[in-house]
UniProtKB/Swiss-Prot annotation:
It comes from Sus scrofa. InterPro entries: Tctex-1-like (IPR005334), Tctex-1-like_sf (IPR038586). The keyword Nucleus applies. It is found in: Cell projection, Cilium, Flagellum; Cytoplasmic vesicle, Secretory vesicle, Acrosome; Cytoplasm, Cytoskeleton, Cilium axoneme; Cytoplasm. One of its GO terms (biological process) is microtubule-based movement. GO terms for cellular component: acrosomal vesicle; axoneme; cytoplasm; cytoplasmic dynein complex; microtubule organizing center; motile cilium; nucleus. Residues 1-84 are annotated as: Disordered. The lineage of its organism: Eukaryota, Metazoa, Chordata, Craniata, Vertebrata. This is Dynein light chain Tctex-type 4.
């Protein structure tokens, strides 16, 4: 049997039945076969990772966990209520509703009963000057400070009586009383239907003071 030749056709048939025998013939004695040599021929991945995922698999674990409905970056869309367009959102994600804007309250003219009353303003101005100059004496170095104090005092007294939305402009002319004559003019650009003024003069043994207050309706 050992020296009997095997026909060529039968030899190819035996090699086809046992491909490992063919590899063992070409392998030198004493060498173990590698994984590539023992794997059957045919299409297939070359690694264990490839055998699990496949050559055409391109997704990652992050994408597989995110799901098909995930948004950009792999984040799932929120399940909370979606506020309408233009609404505000609180820190908790709940809609706050549109911001309420107060209606404009401006007026082009004073409301009925809220106009400037010149006679009432003049009485208040005279009382303020009399209280501020009761025992005052004229000193040139202190005349400026005294005039500013009289302006502030007159503004406080008239602010309590003036109608709302009115701005007050006060001026005081202060001088020594020495028998001279003085004329204090006043000129302003205003609305004769809404604006007004009050003027008062107070004198004592040492000085005189002329105060003028313009009440201007301002909106």
């Amino acid at each position: 049997m050992a020296g009997r030749p095997v026909p060529a056709g039968r030899q190819e048939e035996e090699l086809a039945k046992d491909p490992g025998q063919k590899l063992s013939l070409a392998r030198p004695p004493g060498r173990l076969p590698s994984i590539d040599e023992t794997r059957p021929a045919g299409p297939g991945p070359a690694s264990r990772r490839g055998s699990v995922l496949g050559p055409a698999s391109s997704f990652s674990r992050r994408n597989s966990l995110a799901g098909a409905g995930a948004g950009p970056g792999g984040r799932r869309p929120s399940l909370g209520p979606v506020p309408p367009l233009g609404w505000r959102v609180s820190f908790s994600g709940l809609p706050l509703g549109p911001a309420r804007r107060p209606a404009p309250s401006y007026r082009t003219e004073p409301a009925p009963g809220e106009r400037w009353e010149a006679a009432r303003a003049q009485r208040a101005l005279e009382a303020a000057l009399a209280a501020g100059l009761r025992d005052a004496r004229y000193v040139g170095a202190e005349a400026g400070r005294l005039a500013r104090e009289l302006c502030d005092l007159a503004r406080v007294h008239l602010r309590e009586l003036s109608p709302p939305r009115y701005k007050l402009v006060c001026s005081v002319v202060l001088g020594p009383r020495a028998g001279q004559g003085v004329h204090v003019p006043s000129r302003a650009l205003w609305d004769t239907a809404c604006d007004g003024l009050a003027s008062a003069t107070v004198t004592n043994a040492s000085l005189f003071a002329v105060a003028t207050v313009h009440g201007l309706y301002c909106e």
